[in-house]
Amino acid sequence: MDYEPDPFMDDFEDDKRVCLSCLKDVGLRKAFGHSSGKEQGNCSFCGSEAQETVPALEIQALIKSRCMSGKNEAVNELSYCTAEGGYLVGIYQPDEVLESLTLHAVGDEFYGALNEKLNIGNLYCDRAHNMLRPTERWRYGWKGFIETVKHKCRFFFGEHTHEPRDEFDPTEISPNAFLRHHVPQGIERLQAVKTLAAGTTLYRCRITEPHVTVIEMEHIGPPPASDCVGSNRFSPPGIVMFYAGETPDVSALEIGWPDCDGKVLHNGKFRTLTDLTVLDFTNLAYPDGQFDPDWIDGYHIAEFFKDFIRDLSAPILDQRRKPLDYVPTQVLCEYFRFYGAKADGKSRKLDGIKYPSSHDGTPCYVFFWGKELAGKKILLEDLTTAFSRRPATPKGT
C-alpha cells in the first residue's frame, strides 16, 4: 500500500509491526481485526513475541487521518501578523493534536514512537476557522429548526425563506435541509431503523376517577380523535397516536402517576401481533472508540445525535409551555410518519418511534396508530389497577 508523505507525521518504516496489545482504543482494535495484513510475528514497539501483528503503517494512517480531520496547516489557513507576534487565532502544536486523541488510545511504547515521528516545525489550526465546525453546524441547524417551527413558520416552513445566521458561511444548514437531509442522513448512518419483533410486550396506562370502568381495549387504547385535545411530545391536538412503555413503571410515570390524588391507575399489558418497524433512538450504532475506521469522516454526526436525543426526550417542567415546546418533536414525528426513513439505502415505512423516557431513560414508544389500526397491531392481554395514596403536588411547585 502506498502512503503519501504527510507534513503532520513521518511514516513508519515498512517492516514495523504492531500487536493488538499496543492498541487500547476500541476503534483501533476494530481496524486491527479488519486488516488483511495480519501475520504472526514480533511487535516492533512493546517487544511482544509470536503475536498476531499488522503493519504499523496501517494503524498510523488511521491515526493521522483522524487527527487531521477538521485541521489544516496554519500557514495554509491563517495570516501571520508580525506586529502582533504571530497568528491571531488558536493554533496547535503537532504533539497537542496527537495527545488530544491518542494519549490513552495506544500503549506507551507505540505512543512514544508516534510522537517521535511528528514534524515539530509545523503548526495547525481548525480548518475553515472562521466558519462553524461540523458538530456546531449541525447544532445550529437544530436550533434554527426549533426557532422556525416555534416562532416563525410552522405549517409551510419548508417554503419559509431562511435568514442565515452568518452570510459568510455557505455551509450553514437551513431548517428545511436539517429536517429533509441531515437528520435522515444521521438516522441511516447510526442504523436507527429497527424491527420490533412480533410478541413484544408493551404497557400503556390510563388514569381515571374511581367510578370509571376500564375493562377492554376500547377503554385503554387510542382515544377517539374528538377526545384527543391535549398536546403530546410527538402528537398535536387532534392527531391520535398510541403511546406505550417498555415497563409498567415507566408507562405510569409518563402520564403523571403517582402524583394523582384519589385517582385510579389502569395499566394495560399488550402484545404486538406483527413485526413492526420503528425509529429507535435508544440504541444507536455510535462509533467504536476514537478511531473507528468506519466513522473517520462522520464523528460530528455521532456527537450531534447524542445531544439531539437528549433534547427530544428532555422534560418540560412548565406545563404551560408544553403546547409550544412540543412543536419541534411533533414536526419531526409527522415527517417520519409520512416519509419513513432509510436503512441500508432502502426507504422503510415506519410504524413508530422508540425514545428514552424523560423520567428515567427507560424506552418508550409512540406508534402512528388510531383506534382501528391499533386493533390490528396489538392485543390487550391483561389489565391491572392501582389506587393513588400520594397527594397531588401543588400547582406551581
Question: Where in this protein do the model-derived segments appear?
Answer:
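A short, exposed loop/beta-hairpin motif centered on an aromatic-Gly-Thr core
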Residues: G238-A244
